Amino acid sequence: MTNIRKTHPLMKIVNSSFIDLPAPSNISSWWNFGSLLGICLIMQILTGLFLAMHYTSDTMTAFSSVTHICRDVNYGWLIRYLHANGASMFFICLFLHVGRGLYYGSYMYLETWNIGVLLLFAVMATAFMGYVLPWGQMSFWGATVITNLLSAIPYIGTNLVEWIWGGFSVDKATLTRFFAFHFILPFIVAALAGVHLLFLHETGSNNPSGLNSDTDKIPFHPYYTIKDILGALIMISMLSSLVLFSPDMXGDPDNXXXXNPLNTPPHIKPEWYFLFAXAILRSIPNKLGGVLALVLSILILMIIPLLHTAKQRSMMFRPMSQCMFWILVADLLTLTWIGGQPVEYPFVVIGXLASVIYFLIILFIMPITSMIENQLLKW
């Protein structure tokens, strides 16, 4: 008799995705981040659900409701800090996952890649709106500054901003709708992640060599289930250390004081995972130009498959491209650092240079490097 996991309508979906799935025998730990992102998402939804049970989305009570969660709710402090720092872990895993895709040419799976970019946008939107909810100083002013960017859109800009605000400033209506969107978006992310996996399983996983691995496949279970559990344990231990030893490390001290529309903080900056985007945004002195650069800095990922000029898929055997890739990583770290610095000399100059280098490497230097390597293959 055939095993029930292969016949039952629901269980056979699980079976073909997580148990009998044929996987390449040589995928490294860089392939762990998909499952880690899934764990992050589940954890964020669960902790978020318990936070929503005690949170009030009203300007008068939002800040004190978060205080109440931390002081009076059983293990509320733990849930709150798991949720806040869980977002940081989420983005660490996201950036490493995208970096892996860039390095090993996983972007050649077009549907999987494009849905991945869409997922990145959705998670960024969710994180931004979640940051506003505690209604601290930086929450309020972050929301004001970022929503205000939409006013740069010609003709409809101002109306659009007031429509999003639900008034003439960030206020009660804005907070309520942000809470509603922040609650619904993670479920949309979960659905998109399902489609992401669906398209991935049409082609099967890529592998470090970038070569076809159909001749050498192993079952996902037990090999990669145990590997994923190890990865999860490492991530959970890192998150636990962060939450239990320095929960406020990644937060902004301004958020320890409640929002005050009459008092602007000297340096408005987002959470660390948006600093690179903030640096690109303010590297252009024009408002609309900055907004376009900001959107394009992520949207550029969509055209990366078109810029692939190399004869090999992966960078494993392409030392020159590897060099450019790590320069790009260093450039993004530079942008992240600049995003957290005040707007003054020399940071403005460094930021603008790093922004130009970012787009130059992706649009021109990488494709040209690949073409040079193609010529070197003939030698």
Swiss-Prot record:
<comment type="subunit">
    <text>The cytochrome bc1 complex contains 11 subunits: 3 respiratory subunits (MT-CYB, CYC1 and UQCRFS1), 2 core proteins (UQCRC1 and UQCRC2) and 6 low-molecular weight proteins (UQCRH/QCR6, UQCRB/QCR7, UQCRQ/QCR8, UQCR10/QCR9, UQCR11/QCR10 and a cleavage product of UQCRFS1). This cytochrome bc1 complex then forms a dimer.</text>
</comment>
<keyword id="KW-0472">Membrane</keyword>
<dbReference type="Pfam" id="PF00032">
    <property type="entry name" value="Cytochrom_B_C"/>
</dbReference>
<keyword id="KW-0812">Transmembrane</keyword>
<dbReference type="GO" id="GO:0005743">
    <property type="term" value="C:mitochondrial inner membrane"/>
</dbReference>
<dbReference type="InterPro" id="IPR030689">
    <property type="entry name" value="Cytochrome_b"/>
</dbReference>
<feature type="transmembrane region" description="Helical">
    <location>
        <begin position="33"/>
        <end position="53"/>
    </location>
</feature>
<feature type="binding site">
    <location>
        <position position="201"/>
    </location>
    <ligand>
        <name>a ubiquinone</name>
    </ligand>
</feature>
<keyword id="KW-0813">Transport</keyword>
<feature type="binding site" description="axial binding residue">
    <location>
        <position position="196"/>
    </location>
    <ligand>
        <name>heme b b566</name>
    </ligand>
</feature>
<feature type="binding site" description="axial binding residue">
    <location>
        <position position="182"/>
    </location>
    <ligand>
        <name>heme b b562</name>
    </ligand>
</feature>
<dbReference type="GO" id="GO:0008121">
    <property type="term" value="F:ubiquinol-cytochrome-c reductase activity"/>
</dbReference>
<keyword id="KW-1133">Transmembrane helix</keyword>
<dbReference type="GO" id="GO:0045275">
    <property type="term" value="C:respiratory chain complex III"/>
</dbReference>
<keyword id="KW-0679">Respiratory chain</keyword>
<dbReference type="InterPro" id="IPR005797">
    <property type="entry name" value="Cyt_b/b6_N"/>
</dbReference>
<comment type="similarity">
    <text>Belongs to the cytochrome b family.</text>
</comment>
<dbReference type="GO" id="GO:0046872">
    <property type="term" value="F:metal ion binding"/>
</dbReference>
<keyword id="KW-0408">Iron</keyword>
<feature type="binding site" description="axial binding residue">
    <location>
        <position position="97"/>
    </location>
    <ligand>
        <name>heme b b566</name>
    </ligand>
</feature>
<keyword id="KW-0999">Mitochondrion inner membrane</keyword>
<feature type="transmembrane region" description="Helical">
    <location>
        <begin position="178"/>
        <end position="198"/>
    </location>
</feature>
<dbReference type="InterPro" id="IPR048260">
    <property type="entry name" value="Cytochrome_b_C_euk/bac"/>
</dbReference>
<comment type="function">
    <text>Component of the ubiquinol-cytochrome c reductase complex (complex III or cytochrome b-c1 complex) that is part of the mitochondrial respiratory chain. The b-c1 complex mediates electron transfer from ubiquinol to cytochrome c. Contributes to the generation of a proton gradient across the mitochondrial membrane that is then used for ATP synthesis.</text>
</comment>
<feature type="transmembrane region" description="Helical">
    <location>
        <begin position="77"/>
        <end position="98"/>
    </location>
</feature>
<feature type="binding site" description="axial binding residue">
    <location>
        <position position="83"/>
    </location>
    <ligand>
        <name>heme b b562</name>
    </ligand>
</feature>
<feature type="transmembrane region" description="Helical">
    <location>
        <begin position="320"/>
        <end position="340"/>
    </location>
</feature>
<dbReference type="InterPro" id="IPR016174">
    <property type="entry name" value="Di-haem_cyt_TM"/>
</dbReference>
<dbReference type="InterPro" id="IPR036150">
    <property type="entry name" value="Cyt_b/b6_C_sf"/>
</dbReference>
<keyword id="KW-0249">Electron transport</keyword>
<feature type="transmembrane region" description="Helical">
    <location>
        <begin position="288"/>
        <end position="308"/>
    </location>
</feature>
<dbReference type="Pfam" id="PF00033">
    <property type="entry name" value="Cytochrome_B"/>
</dbReference>
<dbReference type="GO" id="GO:0006122">
    <property type="term" value="P:mitochondrial electron transport, ubiquinol to cytochrome c"/>
</dbReference>
<keyword id="KW-0349">Heme</keyword>
<feature type="transmembrane region" description="Helical">
    <location>
        <begin position="226"/>
        <end position="246"/>
    </location>
</feature>
<protein>
    <recommendedName>
        <fullName>Cytochrome b</fullName>
    </recommendedName>
</protein>
<feature type="transmembrane region" description="Helical">
    <location>
        <begin position="347"/>
        <end position="367"/>
    </location>
</feature>
<keyword id="KW-0830">Ubiquinone</keyword>
<keyword id="KW-0496">Mitochondrion</keyword>
<dbReference type="InterPro" id="IPR005798">
    <property type="entry name" value="Cyt_b/b6_C"/>
</dbReference>
<dbReference type="InterPro" id="IPR048259">
    <property type="entry name" value="Cytochrome_b_N_euk/bac"/>
</dbReference>
<feature type="transmembrane region" description="Helical">
    <location>
        <begin position="113"/>
        <end position="133"/>
    </location>
</feature>
